[in-house]
A protein has these predicted regions:
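Short cysteine/histidine-rich metal-coordination sites, predominantly Zn2+-binding motifs
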Residues: 116-124
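A C-terminal junction/extension of Radical SAM enzymes
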Residues: 1-57
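C-terminal accessory region of radical SAM enzymes
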Residues: 4-15, 56-111
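Extracellular/mature segments of secreted proteins
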Residues: 45-47, 110-116
Length: 124
């Protein structure tokens, strides 16, 4: 069928560890610093809303975290007067300076120490 595909081989990946990470006692300043240092580069677009952190959005869909409205930007009601606010949001700014999921997340590559090696296949 001549279907093109890529094999994505990785030597390791990170575990966000949402069931074992507990930053619930951290103050607002420390949570903002954690979010800032995380450098998680993606946002999610779902149901007409942009989410500050795609992992927080995934966790909400999976039932591991609550969905928090002020961590999103609603594009369904967007008008040009909100252009600056949208640009700031896309650059990683939100009202709190972090997302609630940070309290359960070990962070992205720059700060995450939970490195996971892939399993090796044994020959038959």
């Amino acid at each position: 069928y001549h279907i093109r595909y890529d094999v994505n081989k990785v030597d390791q990946w990170i575990d966000l560890a949402p069931t074992t990470t507990d930053h619930s006692t951290w103050d607002e300043w420390r949570l903002r610093k954690h979010f800032e240092a995380c450098h998680e580069p993606w946002q999610e677009l779902r149901d007409g809303r942009l989410y500050s952190c795609n992992y927080a959005s995934y966790a909400a869909v999976a039932g591991l975290a609550e969905e928090v409205e002020d961590e999103t930007f609603d594009l369904r009601t967007f008008d040009k007067s909100q252009m600056k606010e949208l640009m700031e949001f896309r650059m990683g700014y939100n009202k709190k300076g972090y997302v609630d999921f940070c309290k359960k997340c070990a962070g992205f590559v720059d700060i995450n120490e939970n490195i996971v090696e892939p399993a090796k296949q044994k020959r038959r």
